[in-house]
Amino acid sequence: GRIDWLESNNEYWLERDAALRTDFHITSGFQTEDMPRIKYKSKMKEYYQKAGIATARYHMVDDLAGCKKFVEEVGYPVVVKPDNGVGASDTHKLASDAELEAFLAYKAKEHPDVAYIMEEFVRAEVNSYDAIIDGSGNPIFEAGNVSPMSIMDIVNNDDNSIYYIIKDLPEDTRA
């Protein structure tokens, strides 16, 4: 019979999954045209803002002058990462003009064609919201994941990951 569902739980495969759904007319998930809004960090921000969810201010990395202008607005440190990337790979926390200049040299040499996003650094506990949703869009099971340590620091410092699950969620986490 016809394939009517395609699913994976790996962020790395999102684009391939969407392409297969589009090619085989599978309507159970994201299609190719949906990919920019869920793969590019800069595009996601627009949808978060429409939903009333605050996001870190950002600047698409261009040149030293443009980046320094952004840093003047938000201050150091800033976080720089690929606009289209998985997890915390190739993520940099920059705390000075010297580190910014070193990053721009690294980008020019190693990844000249990769678009990077620069964001203000926000010190906060990371909370996620996970739910099983019924056919009408109502949550039938909810849970939260709290990560008191920055995932970026865990990856960059080869540290241990710490997180815990909560059942009773703060109301603002459901936004």
Language-model segments: residues:
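Local beta-strand N-terminus motif with an aromatic residue
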Residues: 2-3, 76, 161-162
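A short, GP-enriched loop/loop-strand-helix hinge that lies immediately N-terminal to
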Residues: 2-40, 52-62
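Short, well-ordered alpha-helical microsegments
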Residues: 13-17, 67, 126-127
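ATP-grasp fold ATP-binding core
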Residues: 48, 71-93, 112-124, 129, ...
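Short acidic-hydrophobic, aromatic-tinged amphipathic segments that line or gate anion-handling sites
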Residues: 59-63, 92-95
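CheY-like receiver
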Residues: 69-70, 103-106
